[in-house]
Regions:
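Short glycine-/acidic-enriched loop or helix-start segments at secondary-structure transitions
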Residues: 16-17, 74, 98, 138-140
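Short, well-ordered coil/turn residues at beta-beta hairpins
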Residues: 8, 130-131
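Glycine-rich phosphate/diphosphate-binding loop of Rossmann-like nucleotide-binding domains
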Residues: 40-129
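Glycine-rich nucleotide phosphate-binding loop and flanking beta-alpha elements
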Residues: 11-13, 71, 135-137
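Glycine/serine-rich phosphate-binding loop and adjoining beta1-alpha1 elements at the start
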Residues: 1-60
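Rossmann-fold NAD(P) dinucleotide-binding segment
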Residues: 18-25, 115, 123-124, 133-146
Length: 146
């Protein structure tokens, strides 16, 4: 037999600490579906989109709208795949260096650009991943994309 743990519907940031502790203390696989399942599926979509557009992943502008467990896991995986221009937005807008209200997990995704607004984030974006509440972005934002 083979055992493992699948965590489900645990909100951020608590889910990161729970997962970390389980991984450290147990010798069985631990998966948080909200993080890892979403990251795997959307990474496949990102790779397919890059191929279809004839672009290198490292040259793509990726916007992640949402900053919970799924968004952080997806963004982490995208960086591992080579995305260099990743802009994360939470309920207060773009996660940028001028923000003073960020937890340690969001701080890892402070944009390395001068972008501070959603309109700037969406302008010429190659991909947008929406992992936030409905209405966070609009069709007007989509029209700003590549």
């Amino acid at each position: 037999t083979f055992g493992g743990i699948n965590l489900e519907d645990i909100k951020a940031p608590e889910c990161f600490e729970i997962e970390r502790r389980l991984v450290e203390e147990l010798e069985i696989p631990v998966m948080h579906d909200d993080q890892h399942g979403t990251a795997i599926i959307t990474s496949a979509a990102l790779m397919n989109a890059a191929e279809m557009m004839g672009k290198n992943i490292s040259d793509m502008k990726v916007v992640v709208v949402g900053a919970g467990a799924s968004a952080i896991a997806c963004s982490t995986m995208y960086k591992e795949l080579g995305v260099k221009n990743l802009i994360m937005c939470d309920s207060k807008g773009v996660i940028h260096k001028g923000r003073t209200d960020l937890n340690k997990y969001k701080k890892d995704f402070i944009t390395q650009t001068d972008i501070t607004t959603m309109n700037e984030a969406f302008t010429d974006a190659d991909m947008v991943l929406g992992l936030s509440k409905p209405g966070t972005f609009t069709i007007e934002h989509i029209k700003l994309m590549s």
